[in-house]
Amino acid sequence: MSIFYLRHKDDTEVIGVSFSQVQADRFGINWRDAYIATLDDLGFRNIRVATYWDRIEKSPSEYDFSELDFMVQEAEKRNAKLKVVVGQKVIRWPECFYPAWLDKNNPGLVAERTNELITETVNRYKNSPAIESWQVENEFLLKTFGECPKQNLTNEALSREIETVRTLDPSRPIELTQSNQNGFPFLGPNTETFGFSMYRVVHNNVFGYYVYPQTGIYNFWKAALIETYRDTRVTIHELQGEAWGSRGNEELSWEEAQRSMSPKQLRDNLTYARQTQIKTMYLWGAEWWYWLKETQGKPEMWETVKNEVAR
């Protein structure tokens, strides 16, 4: 495992962030303003965005990429880099964003139409200098989380999607992802990078608030094993930067939100992540930070993130 340490000890740290217009809409904020502020005020130059199928293809084979066009164009203006999540299972609840016209319980049809969506997306943006990488699906083989028919989430479908992206845009790396609480990814197709999520303090209806027991050193060893076994590079695709409470964050008071996320907890999470020697990490929570600052009079999370990104 010393090879893993030596391989990465001189790597430049990259702190990126995920951004979802769907989540911004839940908070009732202007997602375009929030996205621009994430670029300009927070100073992020690595952003993960997603293709929301139900917003892009509201009618069969009629595509509206205006939202993603805006994000790509604004990133280009600033020399920012985007990781674009493509597929049927992407970021934010309910994970799978099937259009109303699609029979989501027909795995063959879903697989075919997913590949058509991926093809349209990759061909549209592969010539943009803002696109750094493609993430194919999001924690795709985690079948216990999200409102997705389990029969659609197969290795065969995933492998086909990866091959589609690789054929259309062979020059860019592809990333797969997994929840950190779900073992080691010994099965499944290989890609150039592999991301796992990292959450620290969460809530469920059985235990209430609790801290995940995995240590930073545990994740160092896990990352080393993944890189060795799968011949890939490991990233943290979701580092907890927002509250995980008993209700949606738009319904949590600031007092309750701080039970799982606060400025101190954010700094602690970054320290924890750095113990792994994984140098590329994407924070989770940009829409919440903006909502707190703009509508709740609570700029503390926003300012903490700004200071960390500027380090």
Regions found by a protein language model. Name each.
Residues 7-10, 34-43, 69-79, 122-129, ...:
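Acidic (Asp/Glu)-rich catalytic clusters
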Residues 155, 167-250, 300-303:
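Glycoside hydrolase catalytic-domain groove-lining segments
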Residues 13-19, 47-49, 82-86, 132-136, ...:
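Hydrophobic faces of well-ordered beta-strands that scaffold small-molecule active sites
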Residues 60, 95-171, 185-189, 204, ...:
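Active-site cleft segment of glycoside hydrolase catalytic domains centered on the general acid/base Glu
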Residues 233-310:
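Substrate-binding cleft of secreted/luminal carbohydrate-active enzymes
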Residues 25-41, 114-124, 178-187, 262-272:
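Short, acidic/polar
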Residues 32-97, 102, 148-175, 189:
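Aromatic-lined substrate-binding rim segments of carbohydrate-active enzymes
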Residues 2-45, 50:
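Boundary/entry segment of secreted carbohydrate-active catalytic domains
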